[in-house]
Regions:
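N-terminal export/targeting and maturation segments
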Residues: 20-85
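Residue-level detector of functional hotspots within protein domains
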Residues: 6, 41-46, 141, 150
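Functional cores of ribonucleases/endoribonucleases
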Residues: 77-163
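Positively charged n-region of N-terminal signal peptides that target proteins for export
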Residues: 1-4
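Short, solvent-exposed aromatic-acidic interface loops
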Residues: 168-171
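C-terminal motif of bacterial Sec signal peptides marking the signal peptidase cleavage site
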Residues: 15-19
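Cross-family signature of deubiquitinases and ubiquitin-like deconjugating cysteine proteases
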Residues: 8-11
Length: 171
């Protein structure tokens, strides 16, 4: 009896340990394979109702980065930097008052923020960006800020440091 109890306990412990080796997978909407990269940071701030932010930071070796960058050039929704204005407002906000395209002046805080309330991604000068509006299943940020809820995935790839920053916002 003791032996079977110990065997069951050992089996339970083995299953529990295997479950702890969770793999981190990026959102499918990115449309790219980042499996050669190394997860530097990942956190999920989604609450019980599914609202919140999730963040991934993936680093690539120079060799793997070249292959990854090549895939970004043809992947749907990916663009060479700089960001378009709608995406820039969502990711970084404005620096004080800015003149918008229609001539009005606006001041916007970033929508996709880190745990400290600041922009989730660092500013990147050279690389690629991605945006997918999960509500409309489109690759444009136009109109997202006017909605009462935002559900989108965004990413910025830094070609100089070979790091992919990805975030998901669900409100």
């Amino acid at each position: 009896m003791k032996r079977s109890m110990l065997l069951c306990l050992a089996l339970l412990l083995a299953l529990w340990s295997a479950a702890c080796g969770e793999t981190v997978s990026l959102p499918e909407s990115l449309g790219v394979n980042a499996s050669q990269g190394t997860v530097q940071d990942h956190w999920d701030g989604h609450g019980a109702m599914g609202d919140g932010t999730e963040y991934w930071e993936i680093a690539f070796s120079p060799e793997d980065a070249a292959e990854f960058e090549e895939s970004l050039q043809t992947a749907q929704g990916w663009h060479a930097l700089p960001l378009d204005n709608d995406v820039r407002y969502l990711l970084y906000g404005t620096e004080g008052m800015e003149e918008a395209q229609d001539g009005a002046y606006i001041s916007v805080n970033p929508y996709l923020t880190g745990k400290d309330g600041g922009p989730l991604f660092p500013k990147v000068e050279e690389g690629y960006w991605f945006f997918c509006d999960e509500q409309t299943e489109s690759y444009t940020a136009q109109g997202v800020m006017e909605r009462p809820s935002q559900n989108f995935t965004a990413a910025v790839y830094d070609s100089q440091s070979h790091i992919l920053y990805c975030g998901e916002l669900d409100t």
